[in-house]
């Protein structure tokens, strides 16, 4: 449970910089909303594709309960130091930026070098057989050292025992610190490139194999990636740029808005560009996606005057774009639900995992 609480705290504190308004409650039939199918209780079927509404009541799923006869996997942690990284030596923001007077889509931010240490938490299922190539799920905003997540491992224990998902290794990667433009976390998660996936492939996963003795599958069909907020945008970016490595994506409150820094004229709207032409104008990629947004998700028009900072609008547009291109996706709109809602995530995570592995 601590991971969920920590994750929500980090994301909300980072997003709630000066002058951030209280998000309004968006109607399920508001502007830009798809035609949702109402689920009166629980979650959509794990095999169902399309757009769904759930809530406003949420409950912890039975998969969170420790069950007799279910073998528990092992959870270990180790740390990685930024001084050893060729990809991300570390930065930190001096102060939150100011809008660029010459570019409504850019923020002027000053940052400085800063070392950091990140914790890698690894779950290995009890069913893993040494020497075999294990399926894999990577999760962003992983827990701190000494506070390993119990939610995802427990859910995986039960789903694997019920043969609803394959026995998979979970690699939970702590971010490099800070949030939004100018921060290490922002640089890792909000940049529109394959760099973060390449960092994980070159530095993190070899370290996981060395520390745990597991062998990880290299096939995209055997790998999923999951995150919340900017971590969700990062998850999709990893799959989009490297579908040979990742083909299954779980996105909670995805930051498919303009939060990229430094400004890149090739993608001037940051992750907003995914649903503003990038996906529509690209060949279909082998990506299967589960995604969510809350009716009280983030809305921040004050950072920049670009109309690209409404999380609900961004996710509605993302779902519509995926549908138009024929992607396999399930989109959940949650009632009475804020950004990265812990209750919502607990209830839906088993079904989300089952959907992307279907």
What is the role of each PLM region?
Residues 21-358:
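Non-catalytic cap/lid and distal C-terminal segments of serine-dependent acyl enzymes
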Residues 5-14:
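Bacterial N-terminal signal peptides
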